[in-house]
């Protein structure tokens, strides 16, 4: 069992308080054309509104593949969890059949990478609130280079074909970190434009040129590769910074993006 790491800090540990917050942040408008998204993973008080706007658009799916960055350094470089995940709202099963269908060229089963990582966990209560009868596939990226992102996307596509699952991919990432609000917004707009272009090489060039402190940049690239393979286009749903609710001298940016076919 993968127990919650950040319940009581990033989001309420009390189920009723958590449900009240999720009700406030979501406006369900499920869109069957959405196949993937970028959703932030900070504390809900900071990024919950942006995350909620994204999650509100996600259609029901059999399997939500959540790809998040490894902030801790623990575990394997590209780690897939197969444990049941627990949140204050209950248990969520991992789609082990989907995991077994992944070729494991670059991914590997590993729980250690997930044990203390928050980036995937904070997406799960949104899914529990908005959807019934689903499973997840949590993938934690310690490596985020372009080749890794492409290979992870290919493994997801392969497993999707072999299992016939209806899949939605969630890239969990914040944008730039710890900059003055105006500068954060300026740099984030450049990165967001690169994402919306659906040109992964241009996107990586932008990340490296800016030395961008986008924690899940490779996770975003997985969603881009996956979506590009299906002929999808990207759309910015919402953008905010922590400066909207806290000090503006050092902020973190949050982009909500969906990929539609």
From Swiss-Prot:
Superkingdom: Archaea
SUPFAM superfamilies listed in its UniProt record: LigB-like
One Pfam family linked to the record: Memo
Family: Belongs to the MEMO1 family.
HAMAP family: MEMO1 (MF_00055)
Name this protein carries in UniProt: MEMO1 family protein AF_2310
